[in-house]
A protein has these predicted regions:
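Low-complexity, Gly/Pro-rich coil/beta segments used as flexible assembly/activation regions
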Residues: 35-172
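Aliphatic-rich helix starts adjacent to a transmembrane/signal segment
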Residues: 1-42
Length: 172
């Protein structure tokens, strides 16, 4: 009887240890996903900063905010209008993209293995002088099963639905 009791305690303890290990593994996986998404967001912030080099302002014969040479800032809505989330589409998706694989590398939006997607929200703070840029990176809650099947092509055209969805995680 004592041996059976000892074995029952051992089995219960072993099951507890396995449950803790599973919880730790899941926590580490989620932390890794958050870190990758944060790194992607930083990458997009740097791309927007790079784009500001092409922004000219003021001077003789130049409109107050000439964004025509920029790649991404050109999408800023008119001053006083509501800003919404959009997907920044680079001119050459083979060079840089709004879609990323599990490791945070740029990839084509239609490629297999797309895990993370980037979006931005641009808004005038001081019209013609200062733009606020928010960057959101999102990925499916269970990226190991099914990937981005619910929002193909990184959800281009579904930005509002993605923001309201319980099936994705995001960092801003």
């Amino acid at each position: 009887v004592e041996v059976i009791m000892a074995m029952a305690i051992l089995v219960a303890g072993g099951a507890g240890i396995l449950a803790l290990q599973q919880a730790t593994t899941e926590g580490n996986l989620e932390a890794r996903e958050m870190t990758t998404a944060t790194t992607i967001a930083r990458t997009w912030v740097e791309r927007l900063k790079r784009d500001t080099v092409l922004w000219t302002t003021g001077g003789a014969g130049v409109p107050s905010a000439d964004l025509t040479r920029t790649l991404y800032l050109l999408a800023v809505p008119a001053a006083g209008t509501t800003s919404t989330w959009t997907t920044p589409v680079p001119p050459d998706l083979a060079v840089e993209s709004y879609a990323f694989d599990y490791f945070g590398n740029d990839t084509l939006p239609t490629a297999a293995g797309v895990t993370y997607c980037a979006q931005d929200r641009l808004q005038w703070v001081s019209p013609g002088r200062t733009i606020r840029a928010d960057v959101r990176v999102w990925w499916p809650r269970n990226s190991r099963v099914g990937g981005n099947a619910r929002f193909p092509n990184c959800g281009v055209g579904s930005e509002t639905a993605i923001g309201n969805s319980n099936s994705v995680r995001s960092v801003t």
